[in-house]
Amino acid sequence: MAVFRLSELAEQIGATLKGNADLAITSIAALNNAEPTHITFISNAKYRSQLSQSKAGAIIVTAEDVEFCQATQNLLIVKDPYLAYALLAQYMDDLPKSANEISESAVISATAKLGKNVSIGANVVIESGVELADDITIGAGCFIGKNTKIGARSHLWANISVYHNVEIGSDCLIQSSAVIGSDGFGYANDKGRWIKIPQTGGVIIGNRVEIGACTCIDRGALDPTIIEDNVIIDNLCQIAHNVHIGFGTAIAGGVILAGSLKIGRFCQIGGASVINGHMEICDGAIITGMSMIMKPITEKGVYSSGIPAQTNKEWRKTAALTMNIADMNKRLKAIEKQLTE
């Protein structure tokens, strides 16, 4: 178990240290469960009442939080405790490092190009023309299709399928069972018979992109599906063919993006939202969970259409009223007409 001096942690996050600089810290813990060898943080003012009672060895706080702490508590004072927590979590991360070995059970084409310090797990299949840069980890059971390129320091967890002609940038993290580059849902209809359209466009994923478990990103029909740098995508998302996701956008779990949708930079899309295709979402749009977006968004702001939960009795009344809106509107117009005559 690694041990960190409190002064070392303060330096990592640029914090002002109040208390014992030599305190030994072993890990990060939640505010209400932390022990004397733990460091914790507070990022929501409603938990200030717990500060003075915390058993944590040290607490990451803002200057405004200090008055709620005991004088004897060790504090790291920063502007943004949640950001500080994220940085410390990275610094203290004890995730086992890859062994930089290639499993004997891996099947690797003779034409594939492997960089330095590449780790390839059991039963991996790497087809012809694949290029893997330095310090890449490919987890057990992954499939990497023909002519795919993966950038330096990217990490693919187990059982990921990356189809042919896909480009994945540097420092990417892809969680288990994701599928990158499967066919887009493209068909022509001939008198009721569906004619499949080969999807030849591929997928281009930028640098520092994270993709959650079981997320599917379809290849483009002609041009590629594009995920720009610094995008984060949660689990169980469906990214259809020719979608273009802009720099720094965050997409929560269960989101469905229809084909040829273009999403701007720094957008945030809440879980289980559905967005129509062949349109654009402007930079900086925030879409709350369970929203259904059917028209383009042209102005930065917060957009919602999800229905908050009610008791079943209340919901049934609301649903009944909704079903009668057209009739109520017709009756209202008739009354207005009578009043004006």
UniProtKB/Swiss-Prot annotation:
Active site: H241 (proton acceptor)
EC number(s) on file: 2.3.1.191
Pfam family for this entry, one: LpxD
GO molecular function: N-acyltransferase activity
Pathway the protein takes part in: Bacterial outer membrane biogenesis; LPS lipid A biosynthesis
Role description: Catalyzes the N-acylation of UDP-3-O-acylglucosamine using 3-hydroxyacyl-ACP as the acyl donor. Is involved in the biosynthesis of lipid A, a phosphorylated glycolipid that anchors the lipopolysaccharide to the outer membrane of the cell.
Family as reported in the entry's similarity comment: Belongs to the transferase hexapeptide repeat family. LpxD subfamily.
Name this polypeptide is given: UDP-3-O-acylglucosamine N-acyltransferase
Gene that specifies this protein: lpxD
